[in-house]
Swiss-Prot record:
The chain crosses the membrane at residues 83-103, 119-139, 158-178, 182-202, 214-234, 241-261, 325-345, 358-378, 398-418, 424-444, 496-516. It is found in: Endoplasmic reticulum; Membrane. Keywords: Endoplasmic reticulum, Glycoprotein, Membrane, Transmembrane, Transmembrane helix, Transport. The keyword Phosphoprotein does not apply. Belongs to the major facilitator superfamily. CAR1 family. It comes from Schizosaccharomyces pombe (strain 972 / ATCC 24843). This is Transporter mfs1. The keyword Membrane applies. One of its GO terms (biological process) is xenobiotic detoxification by transmembrane export across the plasma membrane. It comes from the Eukaryota.
Amino acid sequence: MWFLRETIFGELVEYFSGGTRQVDVEKLGVCTDNSNVELSSCPDSSFDDEKTNQVNSEGLIIVTWDGEDDPENPKNWPLWAKLVVTFDVCFLTFAVYMGSAIFTPGIQEIRETMHVGTVPVILGLTLFVEGYAVGPLIFSPLSEVPQIGRQKIYVLSLIVFICLQIPTALGSSLGVLLPMRFLAGVFGSPALSTGGASLADIWQPWLYPYFMCFWSLGAVGGPVLGPLLGAAMVVAKSWRWQFWLLMMISALVLVIITFFMPETSEWHLLYKRAKRLRELTGNPNYKTEAEIASSQLSKGQFAKQILVRPIILCVSEPIVLSLTIYIGLVYSILYLWFEAFPILFTTVYHFTTIENGLVYMGILVGSVLTVAFYFIYLRKVMIPKFVENKGKFPAEEILIISFPAAFFIPISLFWFGWTGRESVHWIVPIVGTLFYASGSFLLFQSMFQYLAAAYPKYVASVFAGNALFRSSMAAASPLYARAMFNNTGPSYAPVGWGSTILGVISCIMIPIPFLIYKWGLKLRSRSKYAT
């Protein structure tokens, strides 16, 4: 079965069995009897330059898809195969993202076991999220290398991620726990930095936004369900079982993606086709465009592309800088709430550890409701516009949905902060979190799609830089969250003024999508990176 053949399992079977993938040479019009003979001299060849491969000025034979309907092109895979890959990416993202928040219910028990203060223990959350920031700088560019692809990055990094949970669970000091948490964040990051690219590999542009929503739900579900599952482990066993559970869930994901996740990278699939043709014909001139481009990069240029370009884009491009700061603030609020929720619901409402884990479900409910609305918006507004204009319309129109979403964030913060008091039922502040879920979901969807449309040639660097700054902002937030809420009060609404500070900052950010909508085209016209 072709699907299993393209998975890691299939490649391992092929490698250890000594098998070689066969190529339909007649279909590609390849001359196999003499590696030095020009293709045009093969009398029985059915080669068609315009349909398949072309010879460039250097005599290299550029390997491409066999027409628009080539069955090996991931965009032409059957629907069931695309749905399986989508599920794999979403489940992988869910499992890895859960690794951050699953830690929080055990903070108190870890503090008592290791005889340290609260802030040093919170570093276990901070360093994990900081790993999200560093990892994409390494793994995102590597996944674009045609010789590597995405599949191997997912599997190998997840194996390391799973192994890191063992010393984390067995560790008896922060000297062991903290480095392991940071490394786990680094090796868990490919799902977050490359998952969207995997979906873009298989879905047509007018369908891609729908399935990005499911991936986003996986990214939301992980940190939302993490505290609940972590709390269950702390109550039933101990804090160490948070990491054993994370290891078991991740191991299940590893089994699934090993057997049921084929490679989706167009560059890597074409590279393998070119490699098979080289082996079959003995002609070294079969190359892909991506293979040629990557071979022209020196190690220094590749390192610059990995480490320097993402930072340059985030700092020098006003569009990228402003949206990165905005997204970073919205992302930080989630991790601030990992401290605010226990303060409010334990101090005011006297919730148990398990009940504290349940309060995050409001965010998940809000996200699911927003997805339903967003699907209608896509179907009625964006997709018809995309089809009517053949994909060519001002990228700034993608930001329209972010206009109301920008107001939802401060509404949520003021609501949550000042309804969290003993005289108000506990469900009321949880309802307030629904506005955050809705606002953050719509902001993330619109802003990431806009960045991809505005910087198509450098989208990997833009997203890597965004992940670096966004995750760094979020990583720092738990360190000052408890002090901010405890020191501002007041006693009858313990997260009131802290939430107000965040709400005011969110209000200051509201004009950003409006300004980019108005001036974005002019800013892009002055940029050497944007289109």
